[in-house]
Amino acid sequence: MLETGIRGEAKEVVSESNSAQAMKSGELKVYATPSMIALMEQAAYKSVAAELEEGKVGTLMNVSHISATPLGMEVTAKSELVEIDRKRLVFKVEAFDERGMIGEGTHERFVIDNEKFQEKANNK
């Protein structure tokens, strides 16, 4: 059963492929904000995937990237389900490298019917 307090986690090592330079979100070889956001979303998704048979889609990210992380360092994203409002799920998300917090914010996901959602997208 889905309840607030469910936590998730996802990890990756900073490499050239997830750097700001490679993601075209900046010029430097440091962990890219889009990569951090994707890792946070992955942590939230993984935390509820086993609890819900229905589909889940991300709809909102409000995140601050507060510290740069160099190549080779591991990043861990953590999520906590803090609110359930019918089909809307709200998560607190945080990201840490080996030296401390690098990002924080909130993420919303909605529970959906996968087939109907895919059909609607395909009919655009």
Regions of interest found by a model, annotated:
Residues 44-76:
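Hydrophobic beta-strand-centered segment that forms part of the acyl-chain substrate-binding groove
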Residues 1-31:
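Catalytic strand-loop segment that frames the active site of acyl-thioester-processing enzymes
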Residues 8-10, 59-61, 77, 91, ...:
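Hydrophobic residues positioned within well-ordered beta-strands of beta-sheet architectures
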Residues 27, 31-35, 70, 90:
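Residues at secondary-structure transition points
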Residues 63-98:
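Hydrophobic beta-sheet segments that form the core/acyl-binding groove
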Residues 3-6, 85-91, 100-121:
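C-terminal binding/interaction regions
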